[in-house]
Swiss-Prot record:
One of its GO terms (molecular function) is CDP-diacylglycerol-glycerol-3-phosphate 3-phosphatidyltransferase activity. NCBIfam families: pgsA. This is CDP-diacylglycerol--glycerol-3-phosphate 3-phosphatidyltransferase. It comes from Blochmanniella pennsylvanica (strain BPEN). Belongs to the CDP-alcohol phosphatidyltransferase class-I family.
Length: 183
């Protein structure tokens, strides 16, 4: 099976779109937030679509399984940095920081578990899929921030995603607890 297939191209597209929605975010034109949000939303949809196609067409690859969560993290962290800078307040920067810290910890944990050859591999948990969906919902709303209600929905979703972020991190740590304390 080829390493690079249509689902993998969609995942790569998600990574490639990050600098484009970042540049769009800073353009000094009235319609820039809407275009930035549309670009982010399209990238977010590819997250669902690439996995769906890979399973449906039986084109799952080890590279795709590795790249998909990395692409998610790159996209989410970039958007978190943008909204933290845009709102420039602790009540946005704090949850953004918590989410970024968790993502780095889990990526490092996955690398460590793979490096020690543990049988307790860290697959994607159902709670992580929900977390990613809520994060993308929050970030879509906050990048757009067209009116007060959209911002409120985005902030609420951001805080819900922080709770899901912490919960999923605890589950991952529980899965590898024996490796953490016995290695």
């Amino acid at each position: 099976m080829d390493i690079i297939n249509i689902p993998t191209y969609l995942t790569l597209l998600r990574v490639v779109m990050v600098p484009f929605f970042t540049v769009m975010f800073y353009l000094p034109v009235r319609w820039a937030p809407m275009i930035c949000t549309i670009m982010f939303f399209v990238a977010a949809v590819t997250d669902w679509f690439d996995g769906f196609l890979a399973r449906r067409w039986k084109q799952t690859t080890s590279f795709g399984k590795f790249l998909d969560p990395v692409a998610d993290k790159v996209m989410i962290v970039a958007a978190l940095v943008l909204i933290a800078e845009h709102f420039h307040t602790w009540w946005v920067t704090l949850p953004a920081s918590i989410i970024i810290i968790r993502e780095v910890i889990i990526l490092a944990l996955r690398e460590w578990v793979a490096a020690i050859g543990s049988r307790n591999g860290i697959g994607v948990l159902w709670i992580s899929k929900i977390k990613t969906f809520v994060q993308m919902l929050a970030l879509t709303a906050l990048l757009w921030s067209s009116d007060e209600w959209i911002v409120i929905i985005g902030i609420v979703a951001l805080y819900v995603s922080v709770l899901l972020t912490f919960w999923s991190m605890c589950l991952y740590l529980y899965i590898v607890r024996y490796d953490l304390f016995n290695y």
